[in-house]
Curated annotation (Swiss-Prot):
Residues 1-23, 75-107 are annotated as: Disordered. This is UPF0229 protein CLL_A3091. Residues 80-92 have a biased composition (Basic and acidic residues). It comes from Clostridium botulinum (strain Eklund 17B / Type B). Belongs to the UPF0229 family.
Length: 391
């Protein structure tokens, strides 16, 4: 016969705080992904430090509880695609009050705001954005994220680095010391329970070591002509700024070059690129040709992974269209990837996005259209998502 012992008074309660923290982090990550378009397209994001804070709305975590139903008939069934926390309703459900649709009578969700820094934002999206694989080039100089190696032990650390064997050894050593002390005092040491204590815990000490990778250069090219109004320019700068911040996190010493153009192209500093404005006509070819010259002078394709990215509203002087197409074909031959981002394009004329996609068949040519601010995040993912990694 089975014997059941009541040990409830001796049980250690489960730490619910750990589970709540995990669920809170999931809500934060979900909310960040849902609001990324608005955050990344903020004009104020450009030029901000890593400690710049952004507010994110998050639904509160409710405790599980049984509640009375509405005595409605039928059985609620799911579709198989539900996620944890989703409600399965039977029949139609009255909508909650929404703007311009009258007042509702349903209980709403509790929403509060939390703040994250720009640096934390980059950390959240780093799992989804990945630079295409860097080919092994000659004379590697770029240092990527450091890799950690175990170098000894320490008394404080995080749980994943807990050294279990060393912890047990520390406990045994303490137990033996106490055993000797009790024997000297003439006490019975066998009756004493001997649980683990905080002082027994040992953690691996991890030393970060830099890891070398292949050379990589990002060349940012922006149309600064008169057709690029302030909204388009802010959107382009936000696009490039987030891209540069992410890549600087992933590759510590990655090289960046900045070019902006009207009918003529100029190489500028990072500060000028993100803050200076010009006006004039548009020769798209001028920016591409300047990038090709830059590559010839400083970045041999045999030694460097080259990623030019160009942003424009797609308007170009018609006599320059053929030269622009030929320039893009040429730069594709010497680059690992060439990205073309078209911002808030005109709906009245056929833009360069359609001309490029019709005439350019190179596999390393990637084009995206940003028709509104919320498209910015999807454009970034398309340009750099993991599926674009080269074989």
């Amino acid at each position: 016969m089975a014997i059941f012992r009541d040990r409830t008074d001796k049980q250690v309660d489960h730490d619910r705080a750990i589970e709540d923290k995990r669920r809170h982090r999931q809500l934060v990550e979900k909310s960040i992904k849902e609001n990324l378009g608005d955050i990344l397209s903020e004009e104020s994001i450009v030029g901000q430090s890593k400690n710049k804070k952004f507010k994110i709305p998050i639904k509160s975590i409710k405790e599980y509880q049984f509640v009375y139903g509405k005595n409605s008939k039928g059985v609620a069934t799911g579709t198989g695609e539900e996620k944890r926390g989703d409600k399965i309703e039977s029949g139609s459900k009255k909508a909650m009050g929404k703007g311009n649709k009258g007042a509702g009578n349903e209980e709403g969700d509790e929403i509060y705001e939390t703040e994250i820094t720009l640096d934390e934002l980059m950390e959240y999206i780093s799992d989804e954005l990945n630079l295409p694989n860097l080919d092994e080039k000659k004379y590697s100089e770029i240092i990527t994220d450091s890799c950690g190696k175990k170098k000894g032990y320490q008394r404080h650390g995080i749980r994943p680095r807990l050294a279990k064997k060393r912890t047990v050894m520390a406990k045994i050593s303490r137990k033996q010391s106490k055993k000797r002390a009790l024997i000297e005092e003439g006490k019975d040491y066998k009756t004493e329970r001997f649980p683990f204590r905080e002082e027994d815990l040992r953690y691996y000490k991890v030393k970060m070591q830099p890891k070398k990778a292949s050379n990589a250069v990002m060349i940012f090219i922006m149309d600064a002509s008169g057709s690029m109004d302030s909204t388009k320019k802010y959107l382009a700068r936000s696009y490039f700024f987030v891209l540069s911040r992410f890549l600087k996190r992933k590759y510590n010493n990655i090289a960046f070059e900045f070019i902006y153009h009207t009918t003529i192209a100029k190489r500028v500093s990072e500060y000028e690129f993100f803050h200076k404005s010009e006006s004039g006509g548009t020769y798209i070819s001028s920016g591409i040709v300047e990038a090709i010259k830059l590559i010839d002078e400083k970045y041999p394709p045999s030694e460097w992974n080259i990623y030019p990215v160009y942003a424009s509203d797609g308007d170009n002087w018609s006599e320059d269209n053929v030269k622009a197409i030929e320039s893009v074909k040429e730069i594709c031959k010497i680059s690992n990837m060439f990205g073309y981002a078209e911002l808030l394009p005109s709906t009245y004329t056929q833009t360069m996005y359609y001309k490029f996609n019709k005439e350019i068949n190179e596999k390393n040519f990637i084009s995206v259209v940003i028709k509104e601010k919320k498209d910015l995040w999807e454009a970034l993912k398309t340009m750099l998502k993991q599926e674009l990694k080269e074989d």
